[in-house]
A protein has these predicted regions:
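Conserved mixed alpha/beta catalytic, RNA-binding, or beta-rich assembly cores of soluble enzyme
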Residues: 1, 5-15, 19-22, 26-105, ...
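C-terminal non-catalytic interaction/assembly regions of soluble proteins
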Residues: 217, 227-289, 296-301, 307-311
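Short, surface-exposed, charge-dense and proline/glycine-enriched linear segments
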Residues: 69-78, 108-118, 254-267, 287-296
């Protein structure tokens, strides 16, 4: 029966359409609901197509938009109950979905959405240092319309603008788009664009603690949020490196591995400095810079090869879209 498979369906699919009674669906999916950042969009439709109901993950999962699309296609009544939507207000998590931004903290998302529904004007502030700041500005303006203003500012400017928090009502709720670590407030929703990759090289049997320390030091130098990483990267011979894999699991990061044949042309093209020892050991003499650039599909390094105990780290800027 479907009940025996719904758990696997939740893991395998981003969108689930159930054509049956709403109550059946609620009971069936209840044990598998985790968090709005993980759950698939669930839409329910009656068997004759009169009503299409957005049940789960309306914003981040896109269930509300999917409900509208299905309803339009079959001439059904869409049923959407999220407060921002029924009041015709722009929810920041919808922009996050469209622009592939990560919600930094879900409690502040709740706080800011509540402020929007309560009639408060919520402005958007975009970090001027982002490579795609101009495009994000246009997307944010199109999203919020007349319900707020969009500002492209330096983080120094942002720090001087009051923000509402738990201890004071001074300032306003706001949405900030940045890949940098900044001060946190209860009514400041931070949306994280994916802007960089990190190439990592390490000696055989390097413990995860040394790799994690190298990662954290590199992030701290550039004030980068770990949530803005696209992927980590290394050479294929490190795909079974226990310390590296454990470090990735702790960081919650994906990692990709490149072969020496994939790396060698870029090393030559960009004239990347090679270590004779590393080249003699694995066939290429530059791991961290090369793999960071390959993963980023760019030629721009934010951090050149930096040597830490038994570990090397480089950071590349992702080509803006």
């Amino acid at each position: 029966s479907l009940k025996n498979h719904i758990g696997q369906i939740f893991k395998d699919y981003d969108q689930v359409l159930c054509i049956m009674a709403l109550g059946i669906v609620v009971r069936m999916i209840a044990p598998y609901i985790e968090h709005k950042s993980k759950d698939p969009a669930v839409v329910v439709m009656d068997e004759v197509g009169h009503h299409v109901i957005s049940l789960l993950s309306g914003h981040l999962g896109g269930a509300n938009e999917w409900t509208q699309s299905i309803s339009l296609a079959i001439d059904a009544d869409p049923v959407i109950t999220t407060a921002t939507d029924v009041n015709g207000l722009p929810a920041p998590d919808v922009l996050a979905r469209h622009e592939h931004l990560l919600v930094d903290d879900f409690q502040t998302l709740i706080n800011v959405n509540s402020a929007i529904v309560g009639g408060e004007r919520v402005d958007y502030y975009i970090d001027a240092s982002l490579p795609n700041a101009e495009r994000l500005e246009q997307a944010a303006k199109a999203h919020i319309g007349e319900h707020g203003m969009v500002h492209v500012v330096s983080l120094e400017e942002l720090a001087s603008i009051p923000c509402k928090n738990e201890s004071t009502e001074d300032g306003s709720s706001r949405v900030v788009i940045t890949d940098k670590v900044i001060a946190e407030y209860g009514h400041q929703l931070i949306l994280r664009p994916r802007t960089y990759t990190m190439g990592i090289g390490c000696r055989r049997d390097t413990p995860k603690e040394l790799i994690l320390d190298a990662i954290q030091q590199s992030l701290a130098v550039h004030k980068l949020s770990p949530k803005s990483l696209v992927t980590a990267a290394s050479v294929i011979v490190k795909q079974d490196e226990v310390g590296l894999l454990e470090a990735m699991q702790i960081m919650g990061w994906p990692i990709v591995f490149y072969t020496q044949d994939e790396m060698a042309p870029l090393i030559e093209e960009e004239e990347l400095k090679e270590s004779n020892f590393v080249k003699g050991t694995i066939g290429v003499g530059n791991v961290c810079e090369t793999t960071a650039l390959l993963a980023a599909k760019s030629r721009t390094l934010i951090q050149h090869k930096t040597i830490y105990p038994k570990t090397t780290v480089a950071i590349a800027q992702v080509t803006s879209k």
